[in-house]
Amino acid sequence: MLKDGSMLEISRPCGKDAAEILSYLKIIGGETHFLMMDSNGLGISEEKEAAILEDSLKEERGGMHIGRINGEIACMFSLVCSHRRKTAHTGEIALSVQEKFWHIGVGSAIMETLIKLAEDACVENIELGVYADNVRAIALYERYGFEAAGRHRRKFYADGIYYDQLIMDKYIEVDQNKLREIRKACPR
């Protein structure tokens, strides 16, 4: 349950969610400069998005997720795990929350879910990239144990301004026997 008493229903999106997700991405893209898109969204077709979503469902470790409040997409997040032996212990997270759902605990709920997904996937090193001027997001990540690991200078460009990207990561304990099995199944 969130701070306002509403429930966040988390699920894996599929192809039939494509149109709604593309609309969501246009909304959030117009709400802040902290995302990789603007109010034009991703600029891909509904069919292409549906294929991406269906491919994501095949992902056994991590994958894409949406969170709904009263049936409406409030957030989207993902954990992308490495499929290589040398980096099978790593995964990258990304998340977004629609502005009208800010300040009610959605970000915290997402972070708790992502950390649990990482544990289940035997991801020891969870990584993320964030605009260096996104102080609220950085504070959220720090509350969940993420630390600054590096910086990409002038990584993003929007409205005539360059922005740095802060790289953050968190290390967690995982089942080493399970991780060895995952590594064995990975291509070189």
Model-identified regions with their sequence ranges:
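Conserved GNAT acetyl-CoA-binding A-motif
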Residues: 111, 118-129
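Active-site acidic-Proline motif in GNAT/NAT acetyltransferases
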Residues: 95-100, 104, 132-133
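Acetyl-CoA-dependent GNAT
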Residues: 29, 41-98, 111-112, 117, ...
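Glycine-rich phosphate/pyrophosphate-binding loop shared by adenosine-nucleotide-utilizing enzymes
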Residues: 6-8, 70-76, 163
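A short beta-loop-alpha structural element at the N-terminal edge
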Residues: 8-23
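Short glycine/proline-centered loop/turn elements that form peptide/ligand docking sites
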Residues: 107, 111, 133-137, 154-159
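Conserved catalytic-core motifs of GNAT/GCN5-like acyltransferases
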Residues: 127-131, 142, 147-163
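Terminal substrate-recognition subdomain of acyl/acetyltransferases
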Residues: 1-4, 161-188
